[in-house]
Curated annotation (Swiss-Prot):
Upper classification of the organism: Bacteria, Pseudomonadati, Pseudomonadota, Gammaproteobacteria, Thiotrichales
Source organism: Francisella tularensis subsp. tularensis (strain SCHU S4 / Schu 4)
GO cellular component: cytoplasm
Cofactor: Zn(2+)
Keyword set includes Zinc-finger: no
Protein name as annotated: Endoribonuclease YbeY
EC numbers for this chain: 3.1.-.-
Note on how the cofactor is bound: Binds 1 zinc ion.
Signal peptide positions on this chain: none
Residues that, per the record, bind Zn(2+): 123, 127, 133
Family statement: Belongs to the endoribonuclease YbeY family.
Function: Single strand-specific metallo-endoribonuclease involved in late-stage 70S ribosome quality control and in maturation of the 3' terminus of the 16S rRNA.
PANTHER family: ENDORIBONUCLEASE YBEY, CHLOROPLASTIC
Length: 168
């Protein structure tokens, strides 16, 4: 199933061929709106691919050299030479999410599934905007921004339990 969801000049192209269960698409569009507003982006388009654990494991192995399923992988758009700016500037990239991984994580971490979806989608959007967490300083910047954005949605800090477990 392919569906385009649009709010003003913000678009999410949902690609969910196997019709995996996903939360309200309006929730995810609200996440895009928050991230876009925070970064003063007036036009944005994202592809959101919903896949199985097997599919995301293959993608994870191919692009990250990790042979295991993961919750999300983001691919920032790289503008091909010759593509007009007015076409390329709006497209942020592709996000791939495995709903079964999110469901398991939400259960293990005692989180509401919709809250976890919104957190992970925001996390992926931030990757598309160049944020990363390769070192502790980058991780802190990205996590703090996620916490701020999630608070605007009424979602608690998703890192509290992890911080306590990891001693961070």
């Amino acid at each position: 199933m392919k569906r385009k969801l649009k709010m003003d000049n913000l678009n999410i192209n949902f690609i969910n061929d196997d019709e995996h269960p996903i939360p309200s698409q309006d929730l995810l569009l609200k996440c895009l709106q928050l991230v876009a507003n925070k970064h003063h982006i007036s036009h944005a388009e994202v592809n959101l691919n919903i896949v199985s654990n097997d599919e995301i494991q293959q993608i994870n192995k191919q692009f990250r050299n990790k042979d295991k399923p993961t919750n999300i992988i983001s691919f920032e758009f790289e503008k091909p030479q010759g593509l007009p700016d007015d076409i390329a500037n709006d497209f942020l990239g592709d996000i791939v999410i495995a709903p079964a991984v999110l469901e398991n994580e939400a259960k293990e971490q005692n989180k509401e599934l919709n809250d976890h979806w919104q957190h992970i989608f925001i996390h992926g959007l931030l990757h598309l905007l160049g944020y990363d967490h390769q070192d502790d300083q980058e991780a802190e910047v990205m996590e703090n921004l996620e916490i701020q954005l999630l608070a605007q949605l009424g979602i608690a800090n998703p890192y509290i339990e992890q911080e306590n477990q990891n001693g961070r």
